[in-house]
A protein has these predicted regions:
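Small/polar-rich, solvent-exposed N-terminal microdomains that initiate assembly or binding
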Residues: 1-58, 80, 84
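Short, charged interaction patches at domain edges and termini
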Residues: 1-11, 52-67, 100-124
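Short, low-complexity intrinsically disordered segments
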Residues: 34, 82, 98, 114-116
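Short, conserved turn/kink motifs that form compact alpha/beta structural patches or helix kinks used as
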Residues: 43-89, 93, 97-103
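Intrinsically disordered, low-complexity regions enriched in Ser/Pro/Gly/Gln/His and often acidic
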Residues: 29, 93, 109-111
Length: 124
């Protein structure tokens, strides 16, 4: 996995740990337990939830110097995402110099969660 994407994930996790000290537990950003490729269960993740996914564009994660596609998913019960979408956007811009945005979209899920997705190509 490209170093920039690794540092981005580290930054996101640090950001979420910092949020855990809030006195309002419903606004704490939860991170997927393993950090990758999981989907939230609406009843078990509180108000807000973050996940990361990554993989090489050609499907072979073993080779070095590959272009990777990475994505960050944010789920929230509130339409404004408690301000997290803007903070995540800022973190993506700040920590991932080699990230090229492929897609960004939002929608409401079948479990009444609001979903933001940032998809990037990351040069290896």
């Amino acid at each position: 996995m490209p170093e920039d994407y690794t540092s981005l994930v580290t930054a996101m996790k640090a950001l979420t740990q910092a949020s855990a000290v809030t006195s309002e537990p419903d606004k704490v950003l939860k991170v997927a337990e393993d950090g990758w490729d999981t989907r939230p269960d609406a009843d078990s993740y509180g108000e807000i939830y973050l996940e990361f996914e990554t993989g090489s564009l050609d499907g072979d994660n073993r080779k070095k110097n590959r272009a990777f596609e990475g994505s960050v998913h944010l789920f929230s019960r509130k339409r404004d995402g408690e301000g997290w979408p803007a903070l995540i956007e800022q973190t993506l811009t700040e920590y991932c110099d080699s990230c090229w945005r492929l897609d960004y979209h939002t929608h409401e899920t079948e479990t009444n969660l609001f979903h933001w997705e940032w998809v990037y190509q990351v040069e290896g």
